[in-house]
Amino acid sequence: MSARGTSLTGMPLVSAGILLYRVTDDGLEVLLGHPGGPFYSRKDDDTWTVFKGELDGNEDRYAVALREFEEETGHLPPPDADPIDLGEIVQRGGKHVVAWALEGDLDPDEAASNTFEMEWPPRSGRTAEFPEIDRVGWFDLATASTKIRAAQRPFLERLEAALA
């Protein structure tokens, strides 16, 4: 990576993701993931995210979104759900994120994320393994808007507008 949010070729990094939603008696709820690892362990508000991952080259964006949902929840996305295109946002570091909403249900207690390794503690020479997503939860839109990363809030607004 040559600069934050760009690839070695200078092109912006792009991630693709899925925002799972359900409609309950209490209204619209969305499923968000809390990033794993030591940097996020004490953070909550403005930290949760849609389930997403970076594209590798010219991969199909929607296919990447579906794959990343499975990797980060341990579950296949709902196969018969009609995707709602939530468009694209740019996060603070310059990374572009595209997302689709799918209607479905998932028990957060049954979610299991893939893992990553990093040196921890810093400069210790030791490697530790962490889940990419350490918590998963359903939130009503008001709560979700405080939990989700600020740059991703438009996804919530676009979903609400699409379902109105």
Q: How should these model regions be labeled?
A:
Residues 137, 141-164:
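Charged phosphate-binding loop/patch that engages nucleotide di/tri-phosphates or the phosphate backbone
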Residues 50-85, 140:
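The catalytic Nudix box helix
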Residues 8-50, 100:
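N-terminal strand-loop-strand
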Residues 1-9:
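Actinobacteria-biased recognition of intrinsically disordered, low-complexity terminal regions
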Residues 24-27, 37-40, 56-57, 93-94, ...:
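Short, charged/polar surface micro-motifs in flexible loops or helix N-caps
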Residues 6, 84-90:
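Short, solvent-exposed loop/turn elements at beta->coil junctions and helix N-caps
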Residues 128-134:
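Non-DNA-binding regulatory cores of transcription-related proteins
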Residues 88-125, 137, 159:
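Active-site-adjacent beta-strand/loop module that shapes the phosphate/pyrophosphate-binding cleft
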